[in-house]
Amino acid sequence: PMATEKSVGEGEVSEGLCDYYREKTAGGYFGLVITEHSYINKEGQASVGQVSVSCDTDIEGLKRLVEVVHVSGSKVIAQINHAGGKAICALDGSVTAPAPTGMPYTTTRGEAVEAHTMSQAEIDQVIADFAAAARRVKAAGYDGVEIHSAHGYLLNQFYSPISNRREDSYTGETIEGRT
């Protein structure tokens, strides 16, 4: 997947985004396309221009994107994500980004952000938001969903004992806590 940052407004699918996938899938050379990582809630947005799967109002635009890929004969999978400590919600300093452990993080653009240790309620909400995003993806007609858990984003932060210094059941000290 590529991160084109071609969404508009609050992460809505744009004509430019559709044009990008139309061009890339033209000719039917791809059996499967995994679209760029899309945020499951506003607190988990990794960059301006990232596609949203965080609201039911996103479904219509996502349907347009699915149709563009399906016209080429390709299957399409959505990649859903939460940026965790790398979230841009913290760039203006008014809030801190949610993360396994409160500590400084760096966004994908190199900006420093401060993160706070997620509460159990926040963890439960993120789990619910991933499930809701997957339902939206299904409603939009995608052929599958991939949960992004790499590149230092939230799930990867939980997997790493470097960024996960929790002392509860989500501890980064044990395999069980990280899974």
Residue ranges with predicted function:
Residues 41-45, 88-89, 154-158, 162:
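Short acidic/His/Gly/Ser-rich catalytic and metal-binding motifs that mark active-site loops
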Residues 11-13, 127-131, 136-138, 170-179:
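Active-site glycine- and acidic-residue-rich loops that bind
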